[in-house]
Curated annotation (Swiss-Prot):
Organism: Influenza A virus (strain A/Fort Monmouth/1/1947 H1N1)
Post-translational modification (record): Late in virus-infected cells, may be cleaved from a 56-kDa protein to a 53-kDa protein by a cellular caspase. This cleavage might be a marker for the onset of apoptosis in infected cells or have a specific function in virus host interaction.
Locus of motif Unconventional nuclear localization signal: 1-18
Ranges for region Disordered: 1-21
Official protein name in the record: Nucleoprotein
Effect in UniProt of substituting R391E: In strain: A/Fort Monmouth/1/1947-MA
Organismal lineage: Viruses, Riboviria, Orthornavirae, Negarnaviricota, Polyploviricotina
Cited function: Encapsidates the negative strand viral RNA, protecting it from nucleases. The encapsidated genomic RNA is termed the ribonucleoprotein (RNP) and serves as template for transcription and replication. The RNP needs to be localized in the host nucleus to start an infectious cycle, but is too large to diffuse through the nuclear pore complex. NP comprises at least 2 nuclear localization signals that are responsible for the active RNP import into the nucleus through cellular importin alpha/beta pathway.
Length: 498
């Protein structure tokens, strides 16, 4: 967990809050999603979208991207200083899909960033509402996590494709703040640090001068974020060592890769939040629902209730399976890309299948795809039960480092037993004595060797009926746990490459 003095709930991070009580947090998170909803309604009016077109997830993504681009200070500044052909630094836009004469048409729109900022601020009582922007970023990140497997990125930084369950949030922009840092997996943080160290190795001036000082501060901050995700003293001590290094180089890279491997068993704590597309919040606000007054939480029943009665549509390519498209978005909405498939299936009430068995590509439609053959269908985003999102890695007891599930980073706080084949993971540690030998390494390896998969993780925690808003009667599911239900393993999902 984060070091004692700095513990703030995820909702507080989400809303830049000082210490708030539960009611205030619910109100400020409600205010945040309400603002996104109001902004979306206004954009749909501007673009003259019909109700159906406004509920099309592809239109939602374009509008969300426009507002993120309008507020991306650093990129805007960069674009103004380095003008590139055919790109107006003051404008933003994207494809909007409309139904014309029984066919879907693509229309490219262009807006002044200033205008988008004005509409966003107006929807948020004049504030910049950065929390709302971060919320949208996390929704995009969760969608990417569900759609793409980051094998190539892992291999590029010297990590192993088997570490894909550590990669939550790997596509989040750097400006995503505390709320963004909370949802990043151990592997994501390790990768960011390795990239930084590699730049330092290749560029002599990276750590020098006024800029170098800022770089150093950023490096130490990232180290501290990663340290805060680890739950054992030895892993944290190793992070201190990486952070305090005078001149970070290959030894630190090896240490970080070692730590990432160790996190497959000694799981880090990573937050999970249900962030929904703007086209879900919009219609709810339009129907008169007052999020701020009612209060809202990203980790409780609220997103489930919202998805239960929302209608979201998606464009479907000729050979895609609409049910599979629905699964992709359901997983993204519930931040469940790295959860055990059996558990997701139980909560959803329909079978959730691995990525490689889905007949669907991502949600976005490329500009060169033919629109003539596009159909649209309803996304089925409802669930049978609801469950509380967790931020623990599912290790059962921190004192005697127990084993977390290996190819899983749990999303829901629900009891499951831990099938896992430790030998495959321990094999990753033999024969690589790279980097320093240290007491900490020995200690971590010892903990991993001794880590017993306890019988169950999240003991006694269950799912709840959707009518059980107070979470009074947990239903503890039972699974056939003979094999582990990983979404990505043994699989050939598309790669994410910007």
């Amino acid at each position: 967990m984060a070091s004692q003095g700095t513990k703030r709930s995820y909702e507080q991070m989400e809303t830049d809050g000082e210490r708030q009580n539960a009611t205030e947090i619910r109100a400020s998170v409600g205010k945040m999603v309400g603002g996104i909803g109001r902004f979306y309604i206004q954009m749909c009016t501007e673009l003259k979208l019909s109700d159906y077109e406004g509920r099309l997830i592809q239109n939602s993504l374009t509008i969300e991207r426009m507002v993120l681009s309008a507020f991306d200070e650093r990129r805007n500044k960069y674009l103004e200083e380095h003008p590139s052909a055919g790109k107006d630094p003051k404008k933003t836009g994207g494809p909007i899909y409309k139904r014309v004469d029984g066919k879907w048409m693509r229309e490219l729109i262009l807006y002044d960033k200033e205008e988008i900022r004005r509409i966003w601020r107006q929807a948020n009582n004049g504030d910049d509402a950065t929390a709302g922007l971060t919320h949208i970023m996390i929704w995009h990140s969760n969608l990417n996590d569900t759609t793409y497997q980051r094998t190539r990125a892992l291999v590029r930084t010297g990590m192993d494709p088997r570490m894909c369950s550590l990669m939550q949030g790997s596509t989040l922009p750097r400006r995503s703040g505390a709320a963004g840092a909370a949802v990043k997996g151990v592997g994501t943080m390790v990768m960011e640090l390795i990239r930084m160290i590699k730049r330092g190795i290749n560029d002599r001036n990276f750590w020098r001068g006024e800029n170098g000082r800022k770089t150093r501060i950023a490096y130490e901050r990232m180290c501290n974020i990663l340290k805060g995700k680890f739950q054992t003293a030895a892993q944290r001590a190793m992070m201190d060592q990486v952070r305090e290094s005078r001149n970070p180089g290959n030894a630190e890279i090896e240490d970080l890769i070692f730590l990432a491997r160790s996190a497959l068993i000694l799981r880090g704590s990573v937050a999970h939040k249900s962030c929904l597309p703007a086209c879900v919040y919009g219609p709810a606000v339009a129907s008169g629902y007052d999020f701020e007054r009612e209060g809202y939480s990203l980790v409780g029943i609220d997103p489930f209730k919202l998805l239960q009665n929302s209608h979201v549509y998606s464009l479907i390519r000729p050979n895609e399976n609409p049910a599979h498209k629905s699964q992709l978005v359901w997983m993204a909405c519930n931040s469940a890309a790295f959860e055990d498939l059996r558990l997701s299936s139980f909560i959803r009430g329909t079978k959730v299948v691995p990525r490689g068995r889905l007949s669907t590509r991502g949600i976005q439609i490329a500009s060169n795809e033919n629109m003539d053959t596009m159909e649209s269908s309803t996304l089925e985003l409802r669930s049978r039960y609801w469950a509380i999102r967790t931020r623990s890695g599912g290790n059962t007891n921190q004192q005697r480092a127990s084993a977390g599930q290996i190819s899983i980073q749990p999303t829901f706080s629900v009891q499951r037993n831990l099938p896992f084949d430790k030998t495959t993971i321990m094999a990753a540690f033999t024969g690589n004595a790279e980097g320093r030998t240290s007491d900490m390494r020995a200690e971590i390896i010892r903990m991993m060797e001794n880590a017993r998969p306890e019988e169950v993780s999240f003991q006694g925690r269950g799912v709840f009926e959707l009518s059980d808003e107070r979470a009074a009667n947990p239903i503890v599911p039972s699974f056939d746990m003979s094999n582990e239900g990983s979404y990505f393993f043994g699989d050939n999902a598309e790669e994410y490459d910007n």
